[in-house]
From Swiss-Prot:
Organism in which the protein naturally occurs: Salmonella paratyphi A (strain AKU_12601)
Regulation: induction: Induced by L-ascorbate. Repressed by UlaR.
Active site location: D118, Y225
Keyword Zinc: yes
Catalysed transformations (reactions): L-ribulose 5-phosphate = D-xylulose 5-phosphate
UniProt-listed InterPro entries: Aldolase_class_II_sugar_metab (IPR050197), Aldolase_II/adducin_N (IPR001303), Aldolase_II/adducin_N_sf (IPR036409), UlaF (IPR023499)
Cofactor note: Binds 1 zinc ion per subunit.
Coiled-coil residues: none
Gene: ulaF
Protein name listed in UniProt: L-ribulose-5-phosphate 4-epimerase UlaF
Length: 228
């Protein structure tokens, strides 16, 4: 597990490097599917003092199997996503400013241009509000459930992120690094959408044919973006 712990540590340290977190407002995890174990950031530990061996290993029920700290308070949300989506290898949650602003506004982040379409096939959805019963009950698990409910039958790697109503963004990917990459992109396109709508409040979404071209040339079966 040491290699995975190093990857998760590095991914967590990327959050302040890319300006996605203030204080301890974020967490990254990754899963070892063969062993059924997840490595995640410890709860409330400052990035400035955090070390590789501070990463916490939990099983799929959230029980700590390795580590001296409590795992992130959002662990149950991460586990719900891993259990529902076998294609996910990493999950990240932040309170990055612009993506969180869309979450607080209760609005999806609209697909307005090709930067968005290179990573997200359509709008980045916003969940419904959690009920009082859902919040007072198993809050973090129910957060995972409302993300799953909102995505429906969408392939999660085609929409590698979401904003949870009045809370903030979650993103995911093939591994921890990929999840953080998608979280960085989500914050950037959230900022771009806010600026663009300020310039032109009546701005239409990106045309479907342009969105399809940009997404498929990077992620489709005949993708040709980048190097082999």
């Amino acid at each position: 597990m040491q290699k995975l712990k190093q990857q998760v540590f590095d991914a967590n340290m990327d959050l302040p490097r890319y300006g996605l977190v203030t204080f301890t407002w974020g967490n990254v995890s990754a899963i070892d599917r063969e062993r059924g174990l997840v490595v995640i950031k410890p709860s409330g530990v400052a990035y400035e003092t955090m070390k590789v061996d501070d990463m916490v290993v939990v099983d799929m029920d959230g029980k700590v199997v390795e580590g001296r700290y409590r795992p992130s308070s959002d662990t149950a949300t991460h586990l719900a996503l891993y259990q529902r989506y076998p294609s996910l290898g990493g999950v990240v949650h932040t309170h990055s400013t612009h993506a969180t602003a869309w979450a607080q506004a209760g609005m999806a982040i609209p697909a307005l241009g090709t930067t968005h379409a290179d990573y997200f096939f359509g709008d980045i959805p916003c969940t419904r509000a959690l009920s009082e019963e859902e919040v007072q009950g198993e809050y973090e698990l129910n957060t995972g459930k409302v993300i799953i409910e909102t995505l429906g039958e969408v392939e999660p790697l085609h929409t590698p992120g979401i904003v949870v109503y009045q809370h903030g963004p979650f993103a995911w990917g093939k591994d921890a690094h990929d999840a953080v990459h998608n979280a960085v992109v989500m914050e950037e396109v959230a900022r771009m959408a806010w600026i663009a709508r300020g310039i032109n409040p009546g701005l239409n979404p990106i045309d479907d044919y342009l969105m399809n071209k940009h997404f498929m040339r990077k992620h489709g079966p005949n993708a040709y973006y980048g190097q082999k």
